[in-house]
Design a protein with these regions (language model features):
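Glycine-rich, often acidic-flanked micro-motifs
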Residues: 6-9, 13, 19-35, 77, ...
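A metal-dependent hydrolase signature that marks the N-terminal structural subdomain at the beginning
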Residues: 11-13, 22-23, 27-46, 52-63
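Glycine-rich adenosyl-nucleotide cofactor-binding module
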Residues: 74-121
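Post-Walker A alpha-helix
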Residues: 128-129
Length: 254
């Protein structure tokens, strides 16, 4: 039990497995354990994190600031929802110790090889990967439709599913070798080209979660640089017709 500003909170404790590590979680709300239900484990924890009311207040203030910058009204988010954001923030900052970073993109695998699509919000990442699912059927598996984890090693990059999977809730508790990263742009015609790390790096940095601490930021940027050197990089100009999925797939498998 924890007291904050005169309010008593019953702690909710559980463990989850993410990106090859087991995290001991101390949360404020039972809904957070339910949110993580597909990742629960009884294995010993690699490290532990605890969410506090201060963490939830930080998430609310952050969302309000971002809404103001974008000219939107503040979101009326529940404390339970904001706790899930605070929890992921704490986890991913610790996972940097294991060369693992959070990346904003939609990741789908075909025949056990993962393809990660990234772009500015609203470009159509999820719409595009849904086209892959329609084309490839059971061969295609959504790893994570919004915030996958990428573990970078000398053997390559492995992508992991997480329960933080966007508004469509498309994810799988699995891992898969990352075949390629593709920067998606809108176009009237479908075309794909391979690009070098220098061309891709600004978007890769923008779409990677960077902690506030200088050490965490430095570690993240080093991992992003390694990511750009570890897998092929592409730029896809596409419309939302089904053929866009085939153009992308064949372009990354030449």
């Amino acid at each position: 039990m924890q007291e904050s500003e005169g309010v008593l909170y019953m702690r909710v404790s559980f463990r989850i497995a993410l990106a090859g590590q087991v995290i001991g979680v101390s949360a404020l709300y039972e809904q957070t354990r339910t949110f993580c239900k597909n990742y629960l484990t009884d294995a010993p924890a690699s490290f532990e994190v605890a969410v506090t009311p201060v963490d939830i207040a930080f998430e609310r203030e952050k969302n309000d600031r971002e809404a103001a910058v974008e000219g939107h009204a503040p979101g009326n988010f529940s404390d339970e929802y904001l706790e899930t954001l605070a929890l992921y923030r704490k986890i991913v900052e610790r996972l940097l110790e294991w060369d693992t970073l959070l990346f904003h993109g939609s990741c789908i695998s075909v025949d056990s090889k993962a393809y990660l699509f990234t772009a500015k919000s609203g470009t159509g990442k999820s719409t595009h990967t849904q086209l892959w699912k329609k084309w490839f059927g059971e061969r295609a598996v959504f790893i994570n439709d919004d915030k996958p984890l990428l573990k970078i090693s000398a053997q390559g990059v492995t992508v992991y599913g997480t329960p933080w999977d966007g508004k469509h809730h498309r994810s799988t508790n699995t891992s898969c070798p990352l075949k390629a990263v593709c920067i998606l742009t809108r176009n009237t015609e479908n075309s794909i080209q391979r690009i070098d790390k220098k061309a891709a790096l600004p978007m890769l940095c923008q779409q990677s979660y960077r902690p506030c601490s200088p050490i965490g930021t430095q570690k993240t940027l080093a991992l992003v640089d390694r990511l750009g050197s570890s897998v092929p990089l592409y730029r896809l100009g596409c419309n939302m017709e089904p053929e866009a999925a085939l153009v992308a797939y064949h372009g990354m498998n030449q």
